[in-house]
Swiss-Prot record:
This is Histidine--tRNA ligase. It is found in: Cytoplasm. One of its GO terms (biological process) is histidyl-tRNA aminoacylation. It holds the Pfam family tRNA-synt_His. Gene3D superfamilies: Anticodon-binding domain, Bira Bifunctional Protein, Domain 2. The keyword Aminoacyl-tRNA synthetase applies. The gene is hisS.
Length: 421
């Protein structure tokens, strides 16, 4: 018998479990590649201050869950508890936003560490897959990331989940909301746990985010962020919901959804598994938009949006699915248009080719000249270019250009929609 055992909250992967793990990793990397994402890897540990500043010192992640240690130079380091902060640090340090076409679309698959009570789908060492879209305020990407996450679950034949969304305002408006929450919760202190009573002062948003407290009527009736949104923010949220409706992505608005990290300042969303295997209520995908994180990390004043997937939870959710995970590597297509009025049609075609044709497709969300389109296509490593031009579109046609052979032809829309991997 071995004298040594693995630490609590960790697992050994081998044989079939390892095969399933690697298959899922390859599936996720391949699927997001079709949306134009490039992989990035960052160190397994960072200076602790990075996570304290990004996640917020009052967050559970920082105050309770981080693995902290000092190195031989007496500097505080932390094992990575989540993926976004390290990616943003790498992007800023290596000036990736200044040396690449924007938006910058990155994906990662990394081990993370949190000191939590182990249970189904929750380990102290776990793996997180995530994507980040950096350097754009265009809310199309809010929609695109939700559509991507939804597509991942659909392709895995996972159906036991609900999508919840909310909109978190700017730091100023959020501070007004926090003050209102503090005044409200102080009236009902006795109905809250001792921990929540402390959070009234430190960060009342954590009360809303607490899985047990959020079930209480007094918490459900707390002031909502919607009362503090500007008209512009309300219009933006309405537009995101309209895009989801147009693409038949089902969702429900949860005004108590705030996520567990302090850097969100726009759309937030969670795909919540309802599988009994995950105790009936477990977030498998979560993310949102962040307006100040890049700047706070020392970079330019750019926004970003991203999401993370808990791999161990997703593997458990897959037990309810008999879908085989396939790994396909193929040519990359790029869609462009010359007229702004064709933008919505280009978006629809992009989504159709990704979902129905299983193609690796990205889109240029701007009307630029042909020579710039070709240069950008080369930098994005696209092999084929689909162009929507007004004259051809009136005849239900598009232009297909092979960027390797430079062969160009005009095809009917029906022919394009028959292209396979």
């Amino acid at each position: 018998m071995s004298n040594y055992t693995k630490p609590r909250g960790t697992v050994d992967l081998y044989n079939e479990a390892m095969n399933e793990f690697k298959s899922l990793e390859n599936f996720l990397l391949t699927t997001t590649k079709k949306y134009g994402f490039q992989q990035i890897k960052t160190p397994i540990f960072e200076f602790a201050e990075l996570f304290m500043k990004s996640a917020g010192e009052s967050s559970d992640l920082v105050s309770k869950e981080m693995y902290l240690f000092k190195d031989k130079s007496d500097r505080w380091l932390a094992l990575r508890p989540e993926g976004t902060a390290g990616v943003i640090r790498a992007v800023v340090e290596n000036k990736l936003l200044l040396n690449n076409p924007l938006p910058l679309k990155l994906m990662y698959f990394e081990p993370c560490f949190r000191y939590e009570r182990p249970q189904a789908g929750r380990q102290r060492q776990f793996h997180q897959f995530g994507v980040e879209v950096l350097g754009t305020k265009n809310i199309y990407y809010d929609f695109e990331l939700i559509a991507l996450a939804n597509n991942i679950l659909k392709k895995l034949a996972i159906s036991d989940y609900v999508l919840e969304i909310n909109y978190i305002s700017t730091a100023h408006n959020r501070s007004l909301w926090v003050k209102s929450l503090q005044e409200y919760f102080n009236l009902y202190r006795d109905e809250l746990t001792p921990l929540s009573q402390e959070r009234i002062t430190t960060n009342p948003l954590r009360i809303l985010d607490d899985k047990l407290e959020s079930q209480k009527l007094v918490v459900q009736q707390a002031p909502k962020i919607t009362n503090f949104l500007s008209n512009e923010e309300k219009e933006e949220f309405a537009l995101i919901k309209k895009m989801l409706d147009e693409h038949d992505i089902k969702y429900r608005v949860n005004e108590g959804l705030v996520r567990g990290l302090d850097y969100y300042s726009g759309l937030v969303f969670e795909f919540i598994s309802t599988s009994p295997r995950l105790l009936g209520q477990s977030t498998i995908i979560g993310g949102g938009r962040y307006g100040q994180l890049i700047k706070q990390t020392g970079g330019p004043d750019y926004e970003g949006i991203g999401f993370g997937i808990g791999i161990e939870r997703l593997l458990i959710a897959l037990l309810d699915s008999n879908k085989q995970i396939l790994n396909n590597f193929e040519d990359k297509y790029l869609i462009a248009y010359f007229d702004k009025e064709l933008e919505n049609e280009a978006i629809k075609l992009t989504q159709s080719l990704r979902i129905n044709n299983q193609l690796n497709v990205d889109i240029i969300l701007d009307t630029i000249k042909a020579d710039k389109i070709f240069r950008l296509a080369q930098r994005l490593n696209a092999k084929k270019l689909i162009i929507l031009a007004k004259k051809e579109w009136l005849n239900k046609q598009v232009i297909l250009k092979d960027l390797l052979s430079f062969e160009q032809k005009t095809l009917n829309l029906d022919e394009i929609k028959k292209i396979k991997e």
